[in-house]
């Protein structure tokens, strides 16, 4: 009997300990309980798109395997790598230093899942006639570091082998898994077949200078493209930078990105997020196309040449400087894939996307300049839903001869156009002019000009003391202008100056209209018979979501250079906007021109020797993150249930 009593006491003690552990797990976050995890395996949060390893280009290479390439052979000092029929095989996790030349072969990373590989390129020249120069067939993540001061080059042939094609190989660099590039050296990539870099998962560029030319996409990845502290130049026969996954995104924190492309300069099946850096985009199609959202909170984005500037379902500008020279809309918020246009895209008719998805343009900060000197029907800001402006500076100049709107919103589908802050000077044609709604909280003026105004005309708004609240030398001819700034007040008198003409006005309503455009400036009575529906809806019979404009504008001949670079041709120089007067208090105008976790099992090279474990990078130490409260609760509850079941079984056994 005493034995049973002692056993009962032990069971009670275990039960009490289990309850305490369960409470500890449930309150783990408050008590600071932490667990060791692999930081590169974690999904990046929107607040931090880069891991410590992505940003560390100074990892310790003292224990790395050193490889010197020599034509079709290599000198290897260390373990984990071997040559196989002219290809360098990286067969185990760890760090490697590469230099020299491969005349016709690939560097192939083929390790176990969960393995990480660091490659330091220190003067590498790779050529492969029928496959990728660098393949990441299997690894959790590959870190490619460009050694300080080094010059590296990779070039592929014009056709790939059937084996490479069967594997889906589409780039000079091809990665099945995550790829991260950093360092302070340079890398030139010349693709003669398809893409420059083709990554199935995430691509991070966190340093170095990259020049990539390709007949298709210069960079193509599935999950995400993230860039900081790098200088990247892309030339592409199709899209410059493309992210194809529906949940994918493009993220730029800092650095310099220059793109010349025939297709979209930047194309994302998900989002595009710009927080800093400098972008210059020259393209025959969209400057930036995002199937979901575009947001810009900092940096400088210049699009000197494009068909359409930025196209997305939602567009938000909260900071930075954005300038667009376009042939069609500057900003276009359209709600579905079917509503997106562009040269070379699927032949789809546009629809009124406001009926299916919420669309909007919101400007709360930064500066926006849109200039369209073409005479076609186009809009400066075009939304199938709402347009709201609460801050920043918006300047729009559209050619007077087209039936365009400086600001066009989906009024027919319930959209609103409101201003509550910021500065706006938006010039275009009188025939389709739309002002801000009466529901706005900041005053505005829609002013129509009785004789039209030629390009270069100065537009100003003066207060009752003769001080200029707004002033801009407008690049294109115009017959209508929208003016708004925080200093405008109901009941006050102002003077609108257009060149040598001026008119005194008094603001008696929040959104006022003045002036009178004479029909003679349109060559007689205006022809409304061919007017297209507003709100971004394309006419029937024309694909791509734009009015019928005949042949695409001539972008110039694009000869193929003898060195195999993608045909880019000469790009026109954008209009010179230097020397323009800066409106008072409008801000700067856009300038125109880890040792983390197990390293896995290592395959044995063909010579039969067992490779030793290479030393990991210096920063390969695991990092800790807080366990979620939900996970802790589940762990504790499961433990408690398991213990209760054991005690119950023992009790039945004893009584039995």
Walk through the language-model features, giving the residues of each.
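A composition-driven surface/loop motif
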Residues: 2-656
């Amino acid at each position: 009997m005493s034995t049973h009593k002692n056993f009962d006491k032990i069971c009670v003690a275990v039960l009490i300990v289990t309850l305490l552990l369960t409470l500890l797990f449930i309150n783990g976050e408050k008590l600071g309980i932490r667990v060791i995890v692999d930081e590169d395996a974690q999904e990046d949060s929107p607040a931090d798109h880069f891991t410590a390893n992505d940003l560390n280009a100074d990892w310790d290479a003292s224990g790395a395997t050193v490889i010197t390439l020599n034509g079709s052979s290599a000198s290897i000092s260390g373990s984990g790598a071997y040559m196989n029929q002219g290809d360098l095989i990286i067969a185990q996790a760890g760090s490697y230093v590469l230099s020299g030349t491969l005349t016709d072969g690939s560097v192939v990373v083929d390790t176990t899942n969960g393995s990480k590989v660091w490659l330091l390129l220190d003067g590498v020249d790779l050529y492969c006639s029928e496959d990728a120069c660098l393949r990441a067939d299997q690894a959790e993540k590959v870190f490619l570091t460009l050694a300080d001061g080094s010059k590296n080059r990779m070039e592929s042939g014009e056709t790939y082998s059937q084996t490479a094609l069967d594997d889906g190989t589409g780039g000079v660099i091809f990665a099945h898994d995550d790829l991260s590039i950093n360092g302070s050296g340079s890398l030139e990539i010349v693709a003669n077949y398809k893409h420059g870099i083709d990554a199935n998962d995430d691509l991070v560029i966190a340093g170095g200078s990259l020049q990539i030319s390709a007949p298709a996409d210069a960079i193509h990845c599935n999950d995400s493209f993230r860039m900081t502290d790098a200088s990247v130049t892309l030339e592409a026969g199709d899209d410059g930078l493309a992210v194809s996954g529906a949940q994918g995104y493009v993220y730029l924190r800092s650095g310099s990105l220059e793109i010349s492309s025939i297709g979209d300069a930047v194309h994302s099946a998900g989002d595009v997020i710009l927080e800093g850096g400098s972008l210059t985009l020259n393209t025959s199609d969209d400057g930036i196309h995002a199937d979901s959202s575009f947001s810009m909170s900092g940096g400088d984005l210049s699009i000197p040449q494009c068909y359409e500037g930025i196209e997305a379902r939602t567009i938000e500008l909260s900071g930075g400087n954005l300038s667009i020279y376009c042939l069609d809309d500057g900003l276009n918020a359209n709600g579905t894939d079917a509503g997106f246009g562009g040269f070379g895209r699927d032949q789809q008719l546009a629809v009124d996307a406001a009926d299916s998805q919420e669309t909007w343009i919101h400007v709360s900060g930064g500066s926006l300049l849109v200039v369209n000197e073409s005479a076609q029907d186009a809009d400066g800001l075009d939304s199938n839903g709402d347009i709201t402006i609460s801050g920043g500076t918006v300047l729009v100049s559209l050619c007077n001869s087209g039936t365009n709107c400086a600001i066009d919103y989906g009024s027919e589908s319930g959209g609103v156009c409101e201003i509550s802050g910021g500065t706006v000077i938006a010039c275009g044609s009188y025939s389709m002019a739309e002002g801000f709604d009466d529901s706005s909280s900041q005053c505005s003026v829609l002013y129509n000009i009785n004789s039209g105004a030629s390009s270069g005309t100065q537009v100003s708004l003066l207060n009752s003391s003769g001080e200029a609240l707004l002033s801009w030398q407008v690049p294109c001819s115009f017959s209508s202008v929208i003016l708004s700034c925080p200093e405008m007040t109901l009941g006050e008198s102002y003077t609108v100056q257009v060149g040598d003409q001026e008119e005194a006005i008094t603001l008696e309503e929040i959104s006022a209209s003045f002036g009178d455009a004479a029909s003679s400036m349109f060559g007689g009575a205006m022809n409304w018979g061919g007017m297209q529906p507003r709100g971004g809806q394309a006419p029937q019979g024309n694909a791509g979501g734009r009015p019928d404009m005949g042949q695409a504008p001539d972008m110039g001949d694009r000869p193929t250079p003898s060195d195999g670079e993608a045909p880019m041709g000469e790009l026109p120089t954008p209009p010179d906007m230097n020397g323009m007067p800066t409106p008072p208090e409008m801000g700067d105008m856009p300038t125109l021109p880890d040792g983390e976790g197990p390293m896995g099992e290592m395959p044995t090279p063909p010579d039969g020797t067992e490779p030793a474990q290479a030393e990991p990078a210096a920063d390969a130490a695991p990092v800790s993150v807080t366990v979620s409260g939900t996970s802790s609760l589940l762990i504790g509850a499961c433990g408690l249930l398991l213990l209760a079941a054991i005690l119950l079984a023992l009790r039945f056994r004893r009584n039995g």
